[in-house]
């Protein structure tokens, strides 16, 4: 049996009180905390300055809203754009609205939108 398996078996045999003591001892020994990280709430006033740079969006998401009548052509274009397999591309098209590509430049987003619309899809850029 490996060391890891031996440790797991030993931990299985401990009571809740002993497990609590073990956690405290590990925290002290290694200088870590077993507590879950707490998300910091941002004050509404602090968020206001961050809104000004947000107007100059540099990354865009291309969302497939609807495949339209030429679904096969849309699947082909989705495969070309994303390098997904046939099954994955078909699932993405079937589950529309879904993002096709995320965090791309404006030029790339416009190019993808044009290709998808040419294939018969309805597309949105966010």
Swiss-Prot record:
GO terms for cellular component: cytosolic large ribosomal subunit. InterPro entries: Ribosomal_bL12, Ribosomal_bL12_C, Ribosomal_bL12_C/ClpS-like, Ribosomal_bL12_oligo, Ribosomal_bL12_oligo_N_sf. Keywords: Ribonucleoprotein, Ribosomal protein. It comes from the Bacteria. It holds the Pfam family Ribosomal_L12. Forms part of the ribosomal stalk which helps the ribosome interact with GTP-bound translation factors. Is thus essential for accurate translation. Homodimer. Part of the ribosomal stalk of the 50S ribosomal subunit. Forms a multimeric L10(L12)X complex, where L10 forms an elongated spine to which 2 to 4 L12 dimers bind in a sequential fashion. Binds GTP-bound translation factors. Belongs to the bacterial ribosomal protein bL12 family. This is Large ribosomal subunit protein bL12. It comes from Moorella thermoacetica (strain ATCC 39073 / JCM 9320).
């Amino acid at each position: 049996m490996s060391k890891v398996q031996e440790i797991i078996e030993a931990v299985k045999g401990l009571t809740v009180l002993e497990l609590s003591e073990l956690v405290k001892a590990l925290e002290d020994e290694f200088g870590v905390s077993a507590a879950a990280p707490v998300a910091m709430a941002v004050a509404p006033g602090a968020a206001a300055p961050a809104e000004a740079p947000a107007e100059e969006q540099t990354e865009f998401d291309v969302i497939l809203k609807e495949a339209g009548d030429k679904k096969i052509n849309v699947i082909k274009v989705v495969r070309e754009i994303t390098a997904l397999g046939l099954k994955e591309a078909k699932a993405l098209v079937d589950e529309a609205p879904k993002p096709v590509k995320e965090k791309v430049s404006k030029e790339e987003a416009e190019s993808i939108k044009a290709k998808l619309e040419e294939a018969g899809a309805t597309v949105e850029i966010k």
